[in-house]
Amino acid sequence: MGDKFSVPTNQSKERQPIVKKKKKKKRTNIYSYILIISFPVIDQFQMSESLNIQELTDNSSIIPIPTESTDVQDVTSVSNKDTTTTTTTTTTTTESTTRVRKSSPSPSANENDKKRLKKEFQPRQKIEYTPLVDENGQPIPKAPRKPKRKVAVMLGYCGTGYNGMQVQNDPNVKTIEKDIYDAMATAGAISAENAVDLKKSGFQRAARTDKGVHAAGNVISLKMIIEDPEIINKINDLLPKQIRIWGIQRTTKGFDCRKCCSSRIYEYLLPTFSLLPPKPKSVLSELVKEKKLENPDLFEDDQEGIDWWENVKSKILASGITQEQIDSITSSYDEQQQQQQQQQQQQADEEERDISELSFTKLIKQIKTIENQSRRSYRISSSRLQHFREVMKQYEGTHNFHNFTVGKPFKDTSANRFMIKTIVSDPFVIEGTEWISIKIHGQSFMLHQIRKMIAMAALVVRLSLPCGIINNFFQSTKINIPKAPALGLLLENPVFDGYNIKLTKSDYEPIDFTKFDKEMNEFKMKYIYDKIYAEESKENIFYGFFGYIDAYRGNKNEDGEPIQNGASIFDFLFNYTERVENTKNKDAKNTSKTEESKPEESKPEESKSEQS
């Protein structure tokens, strides 16, 4: 027994390399076996933490190696006293083994510690709180902190006089969001510390509107203090009458109104006289005449438009204006004749020139007055309205709308947008002018997309072109499409169909504008529709827009040469006739080939029957 538990001397150093190899090979299995046997009695014995274990023989005998002599005596005495030395040795060995593992870290741990110690200690920078100051420079005492909740704010506004919805970096720019945020901070819905920056409240809008664009319903999401039950009334009292808060509703913490919005509904109000054909003898009207002579079958018959302009002409002649005067005014749109008139006026005396200019301007005003009165009294026919509805239906589905926005190439995948539905209402009369309402329900929209869609559809109807021409604007050819006036555009409301399911599961109310229908309709009639009607009757915005298109000749440089930044809208419209002819010729060739191929296929069958 003494030999078995004897302490190894320096003579055993020669066997050390062999011991290390066996130690690496069998150490783990032996220790796990010992732990299983001695686990119930480990707590009954204590042993010094300085013991090391070495494996000396092939039969895996374990020898504790003390660092001090006292520890050796204790161990040998235990082994000589009774017959339980085996259990004691095994238990103490296991105890020491576990303690040795804890006290001797792995080489990788030591390396990590060294690297950590090499790094210089960098204390955390202490950020001092800078209190807000008033106008006199005195610090404003910090208000007690109140709980904030993530909410969805449903609102409506008239965009007249505002530079769009989104707040700008320049504080002097008037925006819808700036007025709303200031009113919320004043009403106590936003703390003074967070009132200086929208990002601190997690501010986000569901849809961004441009300058002059209205919204009957829109949603913003942010963290607000909503303890006060009268918070909506307080905010509305601080806002101008053309901005209203419909409701404030609790949402989940991760709610983002822009990302959670599944689709959006826009409305565009258009006077029906915008769908009338171009003015006779205008630039666009003459181009249509040329193409009708080349392809009479392409353009649809528009006897209604011809009769309407003849009626206007008869009213002008009845007012005392002669046909020569009408022709002179119409030809004044021609650049060459304008130059001739300028040369003639320069040769004439100043007095005569002033008299002629005055009479000419009076004549133009008189003719425009008669034309405007005729436009106001125009009532659209069912066939023209149906044509416009069919053109608007061409936008439904997923298409590449790169031609209906700015700065989007055809290969940009973000130009692909999904239009869910388009609805054109029945005509209605407001203050003597007939209007139609166009609602476009889409998943998302790009900059100027709706205004370009309306302008393109109106041009197709005005020129009596087929509905299928719209599909060619989704191709790779870059086309310059004009924008319809922003006056008639408004956001009806964003839709949260998908997110409302999640809200109802979390015991929250869905985001729905139908419960505010009465208030929203009253607001639209008073602050949106009436302003649109009044501004159109006063400024003649739609009449000026389509009149400009009828007389448009293209941009020119200093030398008078046309500038081509992509194909012109009219070039594409009239090149469509050539494409139709090419497709017709291809179809005719294909049909002729199929007819010729049929008898060729039947000849082998006849020959086979003859042979049989």
From Swiss-Prot:
Give yes or no: UniProt keyword Zinc: yes
* Catalysed reaction equations from the record: a uridine in tRNA = a pseudouridine in tRNA; uridine in snRNA = pseudouridine in snRNA; a uridine in mRNA = a pseudouridine in mRNA
The protein's superkingdom reads: Eukaryota
Which terms under GO biological process does the entry name? mRNA processing; mRNA pseudouridine synthesis; tRNA pseudouridine synthesis
As for subcellular location, the record says:
Nucleus
Q: Where is the composition biased (Polar residues)?
A: 64-82
Q: Where is this region: Disordered?
A: 1-21, 64-122, 330-352, 583-612
Q: What are the catalytic residues?
A: 210 (nucleophile)
Query: What cofactor does this one take?
Result: Zn(2+)
**Gene Ontology CC:** nucleus
Carries keyword Metal-binding?
yes
Compositional bias ranges of the Basic and acidic residues kind: 111-122
Q: Where is the composition biased (Low complexity)?
A: 83-97, 336-347
Cofactor-binding details, from the entry? Binds 1 zinc ion per subunit.
Q: Return the EC number.
A: 5.4.99.-
A Gene Ontology MF term for this entry?
Answer: pseudouridine synthase activity
Where do the coiled-coil regions begin and end? Answer: none
Ordered alphabetically, the record's keywords are: Isomerase, Metal-binding, mRNA processing, Nucleus, tRNA processing, Zinc
Q: Which family does it belong to?
A: Belongs to the tRNA pseudouridine synthase TruA family.
Job of this protein: Formation of pseudouridine at positions 27 and 28 in the anticodon stem and loop of transfer RNAs; at positions 34 and 36 of intron-containing precursor tRNA(Ile) and at position 35 in the intron-containing tRNA(Tyr). Catalyzes pseudouridylation at position 44 in U2 snRNA. Also catalyzes pseudouridylation of mRNAs.
Q: What is this protein called?
A: tRNA pseudouridine synthase 1
Q: From which organism does this entry originate?
A: Candida albicans (strain SC5314 / ATCC MYA-2876) (Yeast)
Specify the taxonomic lineage: Eukaryota, Fungi, Dikarya, Ascomycota, Saccharomycotina
